[in-house]
Amino acid sequence: MPARWDAFSALSVPPPILEEESPSQFWGEDCANVAQRCSSLPSSDCESLTSSNSYSECDLDAWDEISIPDSELLNDPEGEQLCPSLLKLINRCLTKARINSLRCSRLLIPDELLCNLGQELLHLAYSEPCGLRGALIDLCVENGKDCHSVAQITVDQAVVPTFQLTVLLRLDSRLWPRIQGLFSTKPVPGSGQSLKLSPGFKVLKKKLYSSEELIIEEC
């Protein structure tokens, strides 16, 4: 009888449980290699605007398809559908912008700028509660240390903005002799002409529902 009990006990012992390795061992190395692109600024150099251009109130025409490369980060279908119309509005605001109260110079926007800006807007909006619809966008043009406000866009008036994006655009550096008289206070003969924007730009992101530091992305 004891022999049978010992045999039964030996059969009933469960196999040992093997502990799995911590998942952090698999992605820890990847996280360590990710470069931090965030920094903080005490305040923005851009002046506040007295008026705003709303996406929902503008009469937008059919916008030609803009090719935006696929990315794992662009996982917001609603934002991807909204982005082409938003870029159309941004293009319209920039071409109609009054750079100076004395004269109006038309800004030329390269296609590469709009394409890159579309990618960046989706990238910065993908983790937000309302996605791109919750964005408040300030368009500015940099001139040396000065920052000139162009327009402010509320993407969706029906949504309370959850984050603010300040887009800092730059004029083409090859046009510097023509740029010098653009922002002057005195009229310069022949200066009211078209100027081309550079494909490069900088975006400052500020979350409106938290006290986190500003995030700066430069393209």
Curated annotation (Swiss-Prot):
Keyword field: Apoptosis, Cytoplasm, Mitochondrion
GO molecular function annotation: 14-3-3 protein binding
Stated family: Belongs to the DDIT4 family.
Role, per record: Regulates cell growth, proliferation and survival via inhibition of the activity of the mammalian target of rapamycin complex 1 (mTORC1). Inhibition of mTORC1 is mediated by a pathway that involves ddit4/redd1, akt1, the tsc1-tsc2 complex and the GTPase rheb. Plays an important role in responses to cellular energy levels and cellular stress, including responses to hypoxia and DNA damage, via its effect on mTORC1 activity. Plays a role in neuronal differentiation, neuron migration during embryonic brain development and in neuronal cell death.
Domain of life (superkingdom): Eukaryota
GO biological process: apoptotic process; negative regulation of TOR signaling; response to hypoxia
Compartmental location: Cytoplasm; Mitochondrion
Protein name: DNA damage-inducible transcript 4 protein
UniProt source species: Xenopus laevis (African clawed frog)
Main subcellular localisation: cytoplasm
GO cellular component: cytoplasm; mitochondrion
PANTHER family the UniProt entry points to: DNA DAMAGE-INDUCIBLE TRANSCRIPT 4 PROTEIN, DNA-DAMAGE-INDUCIBLE TRANSCRIPT 4 PROTEIN DDIT4
